[in-house]
Amino acid sequence: VTALPPHRRGVAWVPQDGALFPHLSALSNTAYGLRTHGVPRAEARREAQSWLDRLGVGHLAHRKPGQLSGGQAQRVALARALAARPRLLLLDEPLAALDQTTRAHVRHTLRRHLAEFGGVCLIVTHDPVEAVSLADRVLVLDDGRVLQDEPPSEVTRHPRSPWVARMLGRNAWPGTATADGLELAGGGHLVVAEPLAPGTEALAVIAPEAVSVHREKPTGSPRNVWPGTVREITSGGSRLRLLITSDRAPDLVAEITPQAAAELRIADGTQVWTGVKATEVTVVPL
């Protein structure tokens, strides 16, 4: 590959800043790769316009990069890369500059294209949603070390470190397996449905939506119940995430609806009880 001139390598790259040619319009930028491959001008412009339309910036075809917002420029850069028909597609944080709504639309378009893409695509991202929704395989790196290299579904179900689990928005508690669960490194005991061999170093993973929140101590089915205090409330789309601290368990993140929060009169500093069913805990050996 290194012996070939760049335009013959079949590689397209989208850097974080887009790197559009400032003297060319969005349309000419997008058609550039096709023209270097010898595609006639009219055909290249038609295909370029089609890609701009798919990514929601077709109406900006005749604008120069200096006339585009950061999110618009990023979509044009993505259109330019996809239009070039590469064998290797390199995407560096391709959706980072987009707002939430646009990101979902572009992610859908990109996923549809990658499903039909015959080449190799390498995506670098800090967004776990982006990684698991676009990739066939996820390689998780931390400080240069490979923490996990598996299909997205396996990474989501069985994260191999607290860092990976928390990156995916899960509660992650390391500990040592006992006959009925896990003795937590941060203090406390967790009952699980499928315990490992006693003495095994393991990681308990709990989804925030699996944590029930009550104002009174629950008397129902949860095997794991702790008192705690709400320390932080953040909005995550249509749900609220609560950071709950306790002297009987490590910090816990719960996810509830705004309606449930209103009914429970949840606020910063509210005293609550949390519950986790044993069947909702995934235990991964370390």
Task: Give a label for each model feature.
Residues W13, W51, W163, W226, ...:
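Tryptophan-centered motif/residue detector
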Residues V1:
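Short clusters of hydrophobic/aromatic residues that line enzyme substrate/ligand-binding pockets
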Residues G10, Q16, L20-R160:
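ABC ATPase nucleotide-binding domains
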Residues H7:
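Phosphate/pyrophosphate-binding loop motifs in nucleotide- or prenyl diphosphate-using proteins
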Residues N171-L286:
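Non-catalytic connector elements of ABC transporters
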Residues P151-T178:
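ABC transporter nucleotide-binding domain
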Residues L4, L98, V155-H158, M167, ...:
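Residues that scaffold the ATP/ADP-binding catalytic core of kinase and kinase-like folds
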